[in-house]
């Protein structure tokens, strides 16, 4: 580790791992859930999405009170979205309300309604939640532009 440079690709991975450990592995009881999450991350990097889903599903079923569960639901929603399992993606995205990932869940919900369901009105309602309730979100400006684009298209 002493020879690790800032430009080394492993540096970002180590910083991300440090943040995960600090945030989600504060108690010894969190060890198992953290282990399943890290295993799922490895599967995601290997593009073994089915295996990642199994690990994450087990995590959320077995450790519902674990601090990392909301992040697991986000990963589940994103994987299901990528696999075009929109019903499952929506189910997990809706579980992100009142978590630190609520804005991402709302945006994903809006995307599902817009892209899959072709329900522009409901997707706009979701996007407007970001504009009204999540002004601090890094996604605020891109969502604002997207809403404007949709409204121009619908006019």
Which residues does each predicted region cover?
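Acidic, polar-rich low-complexity tracts and alpha-helical solenoid repeat scaffolds
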Residues: 1-155
């Amino acid at each position: 580790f002493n020879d690790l440079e800032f430009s080394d690709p492993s540096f970002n991975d180590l910083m991300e791992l440090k943040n995960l450990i600090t945030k989600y592995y504060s108690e010894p009881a969190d060890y198992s859930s953290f282990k399943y999450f890290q295993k799922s991350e490895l599967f995601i990097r290997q593009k073994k999405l089915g295996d990642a889903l199994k690990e994450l599903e087990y995590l959320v079923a077995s450790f519902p009170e674990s601090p990392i569960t909301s992040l697991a639901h986000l990963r589940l929603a994103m994987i299901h979205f990528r696999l075009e399992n929109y019903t499952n993606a929506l189910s997990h995205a809706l579980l992100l309300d009142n978590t630190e990932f609520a804005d991402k869940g709302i945006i994903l919900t809006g995307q599902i309604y817009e892209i899959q369901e072709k329900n522009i009105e409901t997707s706009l309602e979701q996007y407007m939640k970001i504009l009204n309730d999540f002004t601090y979100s890094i996604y605020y400006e891109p969502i604002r532009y997207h809403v404007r684009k949709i409204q121009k298209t619908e006019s």
